């Protein structure tokens, strides 16, 4: 399955910024996914969940789950400054340069600790003529990207068994256009943008969260409240026919705004009923609100479609969804190394 069916988590929290980008009629999105919000130097580990074990995360995880675990605040002061570059052998391929810092340590003994990191990253686009032309058209190479990230966590240890984390972050991602079009429908406009390395789309992401983790005599608990806001600013594109996805003339931008609220709670209870097993009980509530004036700007001959007006002037650009869920999972280990998960 493609990336749209793979759920990305950062520290167990879903990241949904890519949902601010419209689907094409082929079921694809022109996005960089949601894996590039954390610099590699701040990743503690990555957990991958595949197959039936990903079912409890919902339909958006049909292709699996990738959980990016970041480094925790430390009880002693530590700091780092990292510089990285990757220079391809071919000068026509985009080079990467990255600089980031991190600072972690106690604010009030072991009871209150913090972690702060910042990141600047730039990967250049491939040369617009890196591939041999087919007829009169050049096949585009990889587009480039510019990243700016800052993120902070304050961790409050209420007692040895309970930790309360407060997190806030801000990120900006912008592309460096290389000439790619949805249906290979390039034009003089797209070729000019590629040759000049223009930025044709950018994402601004804010995230805030409060998470409580507890260790009890009977098991472990996790409860969290989260808010994520994404502004997706893109050059106007064609919305239908062979020109769908092709950047239009004039270099005019439209901004889509996505807001997501999430609340989740989970209990993990070890049991020994005939065999070792872990019972997981959880609940989740999500609300998403999208204002998409770009995708809803197409007029279809002033005809209604399933009760929705075909005229852009007569329909709202705002949509929302709300999802509530309960789940129960039992991880049974009849013999070491073999798990049964009903």
Language-model segments: residues:
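Short beta-strands and strand-coil junctions in structured, solvent-facing domains, enriched
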Residues: 5, 15-17, 53-56, 88-90, ...
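N-terminal periplasmic accessory domains that precede
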Residues: 8-11, 33-36, 48, 60-85, ...
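Short acidic/polar hinge/loop motifs at secondary-structure boundaries
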Residues: 13-50
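Extracytoplasmic loops and strand-loop junctions of Gram-negative outer membrane beta-barrel proteins
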Residues: 27-32, 48-49, 82-86, 132-138, ...
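A general structural signal for stabilizing positions within well-ordered secondary structure
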Residues: 36-37, 56, 106
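Transmembrane beta-strand segments of Gram-negative outer membrane beta-barrel proteins
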Residues: 43-45, 64, 70-89, 114-115, ...
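Periplasmic-side early beta-strands and strand-to-turn transitions of outer-membrane beta-barrels
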Residues: 74-197
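Face-selective signature of the C-terminal outer-membrane beta-barrel domain
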Residues: 155-173, 199-342
